[in-house]
């Protein structure tokens, strides 16, 4: 992970520790439905049924712990839920301080992950492409899946060339800005996108 990427995610989670947390847990929310549908589940109940036999679940690259909390809600009480993140472990730990049988650690997807052991289900989404070596990170995470277990990953797909160019252009311009300034510029661009989409 580059220094700018690490700084950006550290700022994102430390300055917004509850970002999308409640919405991720709220049944029927757009965020929760997106998480469920992109992983092939029609409902919370379907994911709960899938997770029922799990004894260990990992959220690799857990950010503020919002999906870790969802996994905790949907797994049996005896299931150990582990989350780790390179830059936001403290934020996730604080957000999940009252959750039972949840362990949050600092961890790097590019480092040796054997200390975490093996898991029945490993969730690693919106993370691999930010590591600087997605292939190595994928292989590390895949190595934590027990025989018969499952790995659920999500990486951003490459968009149309003009969109990729625009994303790179904007990212290059705001990368060195202080967080608040970069956030304000991003909010303006997002609003412009909404206005243009509504036309």
Regions flagged by a language model, labelled:
Residues 69, 131-136:
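Short N-terminal helix/helix-N-cap motif within the alpha/beta-hydrolase-1
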